[in-house]
C-alpha cells in the first residue's frame, strides 16, 4: 500500500495494480469456482464482494459477519472479503454470485431491478417521508423477507440490508434550485427509474459504474453525480466536485445478496448462524454509518473545501412527484410495497421525524 512515490505516476501505478489484481482474481474465481466453493485445508472458502473501501461502514459490518461465522464455524468455513470492486463491478459480481463463483455480494437495489421488478421502487424519488420511516420499513424483517425471495428464480436471495444513506446531488458548480441542474450531465446508477428521475429534474442522466465517477468528473465527461456524503471522502469525489446540495431525493439501502444454492446447501444450524451473522453485520453497519457520515462531512468541508448547500427540498420534490404515478402504472410489482410504505408515511405524520437531518 505505502509505495515510496506519489503524483500522476503513482495514480497510473495504482490503476495498473488494481486492473491486474482484478483480472487475476476474477480469472481465478471464474476458472476455479464456477458453480462451487473453493476448499482450502478442509475449509470451504466463502467469498464476499463489495464496491466500497476498507474504511466504509459496509466493510466494517462484513468484518463482523466474518468474525461471527468463523467463531462458530471456523473449522468448516473461512470468509474472505474483497472490497473496492476487486472481483468486478456490482453487476458483474451479481452474475458471479448467480453462478456460485462468489457466495455473497453487496449490491445496490438499482442493480437488482433487472432480476426482480419490485426493487425498482427504491429508485422512486421522495418515496419515504423521513429517515425514521425508511428505517422502520427496512427493519420490518417479516415483510421484507417476501421482497428478498423475489430473486430466487435468478439464483440468489437478499439476506440483509445496509444503510446507504440519503442521496443528494453534488457537482463542480453550485446547485441551489432545480434550475441549476438544467443541462448538467449527472451520473446516476444504471437503473431506468434513476435515469428518468434525473432527466425529470432537467439534467442529462449519465448512467455509469460507480468506479468510473471520479475520472469522469475530473475529465469533464460529467458535471456531477448523486450519492451520500461518503462518496466525497471515501471515494475522493470531493477532490473534483466542490458543491453538495441537500435535496434528499432518495433514501436507499444496499443489499447483501447470497447465492441461493449455497444457502440451500447449509444445515439448519449453519443457516441460522449465517442468518444471525448477516443481522449482526447490519447492526454494526448502521452504527458505523451514522459516525462515518458526521466524519465525512467534517473532512469534506474542512479539508477538501466542499461547500454544503441547504436547499428548498419541496421545489425539487415537485419536479419529480409525477414519476410516482408513472412508475406505479408501468410496474405493477411495486404497488404492494409502495402502499405499505405510504401507510407507514401516514402513521408517522404528526410524530417526530428526522428526515430533515441528513
Residue ranges, per PLM feature:
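Short, low-complexity disordered leader/linker segments with a strong preference
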Residues: 1-45, 71, 350-358
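Short, solvent-exposed secondary-structure boundary motifs
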Residues: 29, 146-151
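A gly/proline- and charged-residue-enriched helix-loop-helix capping module
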Residues: 132-148
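N-terminal secretory/targeting leader peptides
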Residues: 36-132, 151-153, 157-358
Amino acid at each position: 500500500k505505502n509505495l515510496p512515490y506519489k503524483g500522476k505516476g503513482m495514480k497510473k501505478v495504482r490503476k495498473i495494480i488494481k486492473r491486474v489484481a482484478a483480472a487475476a482474481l476474477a480469472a481465478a474465481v471464474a476458472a476455479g469456482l464456477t458453480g462451487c466453493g473453493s476448499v482450502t485445508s478442509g475449509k470451504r472458502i466463502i467469498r464476499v464482494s463489495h464496491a466500497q473501501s476498507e474504511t466504509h461502514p459496509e466493510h466494517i459490518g462484513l468484518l463482523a459477519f466474518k468474525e461471527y461465522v468463523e467463531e462458530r464455524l471456523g473449522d468448516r468455513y473461512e470468509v474472505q472479503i474483497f472490497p473496492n470492486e476487486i472481483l468486478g463491478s456490482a453487476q458483474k459480481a451479481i452474475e458471479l454470485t448467480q453462478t456460485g463463483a462468489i457466495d455473497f455480494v453487496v449490491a445496490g437495489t438499482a442493480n437488482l431491478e433487472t432480476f426482480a421488478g419490485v426493487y425498482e421502487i427504491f429508485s422512486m424519488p421522495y418515496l419515504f417521508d423521513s429517515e425514521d420511516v425508511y428505517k422502520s420499513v427496512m427493519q420490518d424483517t417479516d415483510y421484507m423477507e417476501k421482497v428478498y425471495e423475489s430473486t430466487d428464480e435468478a439464483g440468489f436471495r437478499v439476506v440483509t440490508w445496509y444503510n446507504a444513506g440519503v442521496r443528494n446531488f453534488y457537482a463542480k458548480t453550485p446547485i441551489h434550485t432545480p434550475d441549476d441542474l438544467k443541462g448538467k450531465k449527472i451520473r446516476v446508477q444504471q437503473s431506468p427509474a434513476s435515469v428518468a428521475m434525473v432527466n425529470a429534474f432537467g439534467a442529462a442522466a449519465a448512467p455509469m459504474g460507480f468506479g468510473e465517477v471520479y475520472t469522469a468528473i475530473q475529465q469533464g465527461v460529467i458535471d456531477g453525480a448523486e450519492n451520500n456524503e461518503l462518496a466525497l471522502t471515501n471515494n475522493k469525489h470531493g477532490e473534483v466536485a466542490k458543491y453538495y446540495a441537500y435535496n434528499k431525493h432518495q433514501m436507499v439501502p444496499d443489499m447483501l445478496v447470497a447465492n441461493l444454492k449455497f444457502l440451500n446447501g447449509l444445515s439448519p444450524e449453519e443457516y441460522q448462524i449465517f442468518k444471525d451473522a448477516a443481522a449482526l453485520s447490519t447492526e454494526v453497519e448502521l452504527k458505523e454509518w451514522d459516525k462515518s457520515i458526521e466524519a465525512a462531512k467534517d473532512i469534506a468541508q474542512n479539508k477538501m473545501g466542499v461547500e454544503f448547500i441547504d436547499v428548498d427540498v419541496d421545489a425539487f420534490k415537485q419536479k419529480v412527484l409525477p414519476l410516482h404515478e408513472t412508475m406505479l402504472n408501468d410496474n405493477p410489482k411495486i404497488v404492494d410495497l409502495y402502499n405499505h410504505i405510504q401507510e407507514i408515511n401516514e402513521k408517522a405524520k404528526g410524530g417526530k421525524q428526522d428526515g430533515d437531518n441528513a
